């Protein structure tokens, strides 16, 4: 049993993007992307999808115990916000010979 291969899509969300969660238990939450995982089309968003992990004692955490941390959510469950706070889908276009991301709803360039 290996890892299922998923067709890799262009990076819609990048580290540092402000996003709004549009599905799941944290629907409506606006937060910052901590990590983008393009190979599995997921992102880790600050304060969203908190899970409890049973941590074995280590040098950093000598007592071990139950630790709460953010888990990855699928990139289709978030929308990127532009500078005005408008959530929309992300598209790509060329500006001055450079490929940039833009918000399809507002037309504002994200990069």
From Swiss-Prot:
Tree of life domain = Bacteria
GO cellular-component term (any)? ribonucleoprotein complex
Asked whether the UniProt record includes tRNA-binding among its keywords, one would answer no
Pfam family for this entry, one = KOW
- Show the NCBIfam families listed in the entry: rplX_bact (TIGR01079)
Q: What does this protein do?
A: One of two assembly initiator proteins, it binds directly to the 5'-end of the 23S rRNA, where it nucleates assembly of the 50S subunit.
Name recorded for this polypeptide: Large ribosomal subunit protein uL24
Recorded hits in Gene3D superfamilies, A to Z, give: 2.30.30.30
Q: Which GO terms describe its biological process?
A: translation
**GO function term, MF aspect, one:** rRNA binding
PANTHER family from the xrefs?
A: MITOCHONDRIAL RIBOSOMAL PROTEIN L24 (PTHR12903)
What's in the keyword line of the UniProt record? Ribonucleoprotein, Ribosomal protein, RNA-binding, rRNA-binding
User: Keyword Ribonucleoprotein: yes or no?
Assistant: yes
């Amino acid at each position: 049993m290996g890892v299922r291969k998923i067709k890799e899509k262009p990076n819609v969300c990048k580290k540092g993007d402000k996003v709004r969660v549009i599905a799941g238990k944290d629907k409506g939450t606006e937060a910052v992307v901590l990590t983008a995982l393009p190979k599995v089309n997921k992102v880790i968003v600050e304060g969203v999808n908190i899970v409890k992990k049973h941590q074995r004692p280590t040098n950093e955490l000598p007592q071990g115990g139950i630790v709460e941390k953010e888990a990855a959510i699928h990139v289709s469950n978030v929308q990127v916000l532009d500078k005005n706070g408008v959530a929309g889908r992300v598209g790509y276009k060329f500006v001055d010979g450079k490929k940039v991301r833009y918000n399809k709803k507002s037309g504002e360039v994200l990069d």
